Amino acid sequence: MPGEGGTLPAVEYPYFPDRQHAFVWRNWTLVPAARLAEVLATSEENVNRLAASMGLRPQRGIEPYWSDARGYITVLRRNWHLLPYDQLLTLLGLTREELAWRLIEDDFLFVKLGNVKPACEPLRYRAPDERAMRGAARIDSLLGTFGREAFAREEPRFSFIEEFRRPRP
């Protein structure tokens, strides 16, 4: 895999209580909870609890295009600094060969990701400690301040494609 075994430290997300909370937050509207649980080697119930602790609404149907050739780049970018390659493969549902090809051949994606794969330790579920629970409650409180509906209303991804397909008067 390109850049495998790199030593560049991954970007940290200090506004999240820990990496597992960041992982759930960044993927909640893109990847089904069952797949997130598989990546974290835990139950779907634990993933749902992490999400709820940050004030995220229960998942609605996740569009399948996030794992196809149109959407996987978004998922990959959101997790490049969170997960090692093996867990990215699980998250994306790709083989090593498929991901290697996409990184090198698909629009020079590896170059756009910085020409390096940051060093990421495997991410496994751990029951949140008191500090993590306080951090998640702070995020929940912030969502309450701004109004939860502001974050729940999303225009469907790639909806602009349908707009382009409509005949113009």
Locations of regions flagged by a protein language model:
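Mature N-terminal, pre-catalytic/accessory segment of carbohydrate-active enzymes
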Residues: 1-169
